[in-house]
Amino acid sequence: MEDSEFLAYVELLDEVEQGSVRAKASSVSLHAERTWMEKMKVEDLNVCEPASPAPEAPATSLLNDLKYSPSEEEEVTYTVINQFQQKFGAAILHIKKQNVLSVAAEGANVCRHGKLCWLQVATNCRVYLFDIFLLGSRAFHNGLQMILEDKRILKVIHDCRWLSDCLSHQYGILLNNVFDTQVADVLQFSMETGGYLPNCITTLQESLIKHLQVAPKYLSFLEKRQKLIQENPEVWFIRPVSPSLLKILALEATYLLPLRLALLDEMMSDLTTLVDGYLNTYREGSADRLGGTEPTCMELPEELLQLKDFQKQRREKAAREYRVNAQGLLIRTVLQPKKLVTETAGKEEKVKGFLFGKNFRIDKAPSFTSQDFHGDVNLLKEESLNKQATNPQHLPPTEEGETSEDSSNKLICTKSKGSEDQRITQKEHFMTPKHEFQASLSLKEETEQLLMVENKEDLKCTKQAVSMSSFPQETRVSPSDTFYPIRKTVVSTLPPCPALEKIDSWISPFLNLP
C-alpha cells in the first residue's frame, strides 16, 4: 500500500468509525478501570476526545540533553496522537522510514494483567505520544503492530519484559529486534570487570547517570514520575493530560537513543583498542620482520593475545574494589536518593578506616559467568575468611540498625556463631591488655595479674601495651581487604586500554554511613 493510499485509508476509517472509537474510549476495559471510573465525574469523560487535534509542544532536544546547557536549547517537538484523523497516519509513515527508534510505555501495571495507556515512540527528530487508552487496539491494527514486529527496525527499550508481555497477551503482538539498554548495561559491566556479573540491574535513571554522565538535576522528571505514581497509581488514566505529564512521557523515550550509542561505544572499546594495535603491528615495526612472516599464517597474533591479559587485570581490579555476595555476584553500589546526596555533598566521610573526599570514585560490583570464574570467587571468599580468622582486629563493628538482608550480601555472616565469638573476642581485645589474651591462665595467675594492674607503674606499662597491640574501635577494614591481601603493583608492559582506566564518576559509595 502506497503512502497516499495509507493516509486515505486512515482518514476514511476515522470519518466512518470515529463515533464508535469515541464511545469505546469512554469505556475501554470497563472491568480493569472500574475503580477509577467511580472516582471521576461524568463531565470529565466528555473531554477525553478533544474536538481539535492536540497541539504540538516543545520538548528538550536529544542533543541539548547531552550538552547540559539550558541556554542553548535545540527544541524537538512531541506530538500527542489521540485520534486517527490527520496526525496518526503521518506519524506512522514517518516511523516506518526509520532504522532505529526508541519505545517506552506507561500505564497501570503494564503486563498481561494490567492496562497500557501510553506508547511513546521517539526518532532522531520527533517524539510521538500514542494515547492507547483512547485509541484502543485499533492503533496497533493500523500501523503500530507492523512497526513493533518489523525485524528491520531496531527498537531501543529499557527493560522490555513488561511491555513484551503486555503486547503479546493483550494485543497479539510479538515484539521484535529490540536493543534493551538494561541488558546492555549488564553486558558492559561484565566486560569492564573481566567476566563478573552485578548483583542487580539498573534503573533508567542510574543508566543515564553512569553511561551518559547526565547530572541528576536533569533527571528530576523521573523522580517526579515516580512520586506521581505513588500518590495516584491511576494518574495515566486522567484526561485531559497536563503538559508536565506529557513532557515526562516525551523525555522517557528521548533519552534512550543517546543511551544506546553510549553503551555501544563502551562495549566496543576492546575492539577499538585491538584494532589500533593491529594497525601498528607492521607499519611501525622493522622491515626485517616482514620477510619472515607468512601471509597465510593463521596463528593468533600477539596483539590479540593481549585480550587475555586485559581480562585478568580487570578481574583483579574488580576483586580489589567490590564486595561479593553469597551467590558469587559482586555488590553494585546503589544510587542514593537526591536528598541524601545533597545532605552529604562537600563533606568527607569516614569509610572503613579511610577518609574519602567528595571526589572519591569507585567502580561497581561484578560476578563470574563461567565455571573458572566461580572458582576464582570461591578462592576470594576463602582468602577473605582466612584473613578474618587470623586478624580478628580487622573485623568491622556491626551497626545496630543493620538488617538481615544487608548482612546476607556480605562475606562476613553476622548470624553465625563463629562470627559472634570473633566479635566478642574483638571487643575484649580493645578493652584488655595484650598479655591477658594468653590462653589457659589459672585462677591464681589471673589474680596475680589483677593485683599487678593496681600498681601504677604496671598500669602505665599496660596502657602502652594496649595502644601498641590493638586498633581503635572506629577502625574499619578497607574495601580491598575484603578480597585478598595487598600485593605489590606490577607495572604492565601492555598498551593502555581505555576500558581498564575507566572509573564511574557518579558513584559515591557508603553515603549512608556516618
Curated annotation (Swiss-Prot):
InterPro entries reported in the protein's UniProt record: 3'-5'_exonuclease_dom, piRNA_biogenesis_EXD1, RNaseH-like_sf, RNaseH_sf
Region (Disordered): 384-422
Pfam family, one: DNA_pol_A_exo1
A single GO molecular function term of this UniProt record: RNA binding
Domain 3'-5' exonuclease: 30-122
Keyword Cytoplasm tagged: yes
Subcellular compartments: Cytoplasm
Reported function: RNA-binding component of the PET complex, a multiprotein complex required for the processing of piRNAs during spermatogenesis. The piRNA metabolic process mediates the repression of transposable elements during meiosis by forming complexes composed of piRNAs and Piwi proteins and governs the methylation and subsequent repression of transposable elements, preventing their mobilization, which is essential for the germline integrity. The PET complex is required during the secondary piRNAs metabolic process for the PIWIL2 slicing-triggered loading of PIWIL4 piRNAs.
Notes on the domains: The 3'-5' exonuclease domain lacks the conserved Asp-Glu-Asp-Asp (DEDD) residues that coordinates divalent ions essential for exonuclease activity.
Subunit structure: Homodimer. Component of the PET complex, at least composed of EXD1, PIWIL2, TDRD12 and piRNAs.
Sequence similarity: Belongs to the EXD1 family.
Identification of the protein by name: piRNA biogenesis protein EXD1
Annotated organism of origin: Homo sapiens (Human)
